[in-house]
């Protein structure tokens, strides 16, 4: 038996198959697919989901860092574990960092003197070069540039060293032997950073000011008396105390963040590289935030 499909006439006299809609537009249009609508909604909400996950991850990291900080404070009385390691860490974190800090401070002082001379030409007495070099190096550039440089050197070194110990299960071995890994690995590094960062900053700042003075003598036709006049003009002892406070906080920041990312490393060699990068980036960001915080609260 043959089934004959009937056809009907659409607009304009055209023959239209009965399975099709002769009016594809207008009120008879098919509703949008729920799947497509869901996909479109998901694409619009995706940035908010990523933001939420990032916020949760950040909060979790801060919580884990707080746990390590609490363990570190409880481990400080165990001097018998970390006491003999402190001097070695002070040498690695402080003494070995002096060359790069002095190198940065030297050229910073030279540039500051030249830029101050260029800015003050014909408008301000030239001895204000000493004022600008001294104030800027002591209050800002000395501590901050040194802190950023040491975050790359010290923070990366700590994160890489502890991260390697974590992925090779050396830290787990210390726990198995009833050794407190926090007292053995974290406390001496953090205390060394707190003690040595101010010393390195003072040396770097002094060299930066001296470099500005020599630049003024050789290139700006200034005398030592003129430079010293400007240097003493607005100098206050509080400036040095302010720089020391900042450097103390920078030392704590760089070493504690390096220890945290090293201790939480996972994923083998790739994880060590990721932890090292994160330690440098996060400590540099926190240094800049602390710089603004101390300026807003203490100046």
Q: Language-model features: where?
A:
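Final/C-terminal transmembrane alpha-helix of multipass membrane proteins
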Residues: 272, 278-294
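Short, membrane-interfacial amphipathic segments enriched in basic
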Residues: 40-84, 261-262, 266
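Membrane-interfacial helix-loop-helix connectors in multipass membrane proteins
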Residues: 115-139, 205-248, 252, 256-275, ...
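Hydrophobic alpha-helical transmembrane segments of multi-pass membrane transport proteins
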Residues: 129-172, 200, 257
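Short, positively charged and aromatic/hydrophobic N-terminal segments
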Residues: 14, 20, 24-27, 31-35
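Selective transmembrane-helix segments that form parts of the transport pathway or gating/packing helices
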Residues: 94, 98, 102, 141, ...
